């Protein structure tokens, strides 16, 4: 989703935002990166680079990783931990509209994928804590009071995670 501040963009409704697995915010490039971008466009080298691109993964490799991810184990106590975090978004005074059950499913899937990327076949509480802000930030609508106090969805998510007891 493009930033709302950009002319010609429209804010997506909550129901559509909820269908995105995660929100990852990209900042501006560094000075050096921006000069590299300019150089690519100045010399038309970007066209040459496009011709030399090779896929990182084949379709078969991607599907294989998906099957591996489905085999990553999530203990029932961690499923409850995920559900408790998401439930907190629905009762927090800082949140006007909390996350739906789809957010719980997304957090579980993202945690499994992250665990797999870390070389494990099981999810830990740390995996859940890591992915939670990315999974929840676009799903939460804060109250006007929370926004006036300088809270962001990421900050609220962090506070909610801190309130939920970590399974042992």
Regions found by a protein language model. Name each.
Residues 89-168:
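C-terminal engagement/docking regions of AAA+ P-loop ATPases
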Residues 50-104:
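Conserved AAA+ ATPase small/helical "lid" subdomain
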Residues 1-72, 112-117:
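Canonical AAA+ ATPase core
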Residues 15-18, 22, 32-40, 60-67, ...:
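Solvent-exposed alpha-helical segments within well-ordered globular domains of core cellular machineries
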Residues 10, 18-20, 28, 77, ...:
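Broad hydrophobic/π-residue packing in well-ordered secondary structure
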Residues 28-39, 52, 70-74, 144-168:
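Non-catalytic accessory segments flanking P-loop/AAA+ NTPase cores
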């Amino acid at each position: 989703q493009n930033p709302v501040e950009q002319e010609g963009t429209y804010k997506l409704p909550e129901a559509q935002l909820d269908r995105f697995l995660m929100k990852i915010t990209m900042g501006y490039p560094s000075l050096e990166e921006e000069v590299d971008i300019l150089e690519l466009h100045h010399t038309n080298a970007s066209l040459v680079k496009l011709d030399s691109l090779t896929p990182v993964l084949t379709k078969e490799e991607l599907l294989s990783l998906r099957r591996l991810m489905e085999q990553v184990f999530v203990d029932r106590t961690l499923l409850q931990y995920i559900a408790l975090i998401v439930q907190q978004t629905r009762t927090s005074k800082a949140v006007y509209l909390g996350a739906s059950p789809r957010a719980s499913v997304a957090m579980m899937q993202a945690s499994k994928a992250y665990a797999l990327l870390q070389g494990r076949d099981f999810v830990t509480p740390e995996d859940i804590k890591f992915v939670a802000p990315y999974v929840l930030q676009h799903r939460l609508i804060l109250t006007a009071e929370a926004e006036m106090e300088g809270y962001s969805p990421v900050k609220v998510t962090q506070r909610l995670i801190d309130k939920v007891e970590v399974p042992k």
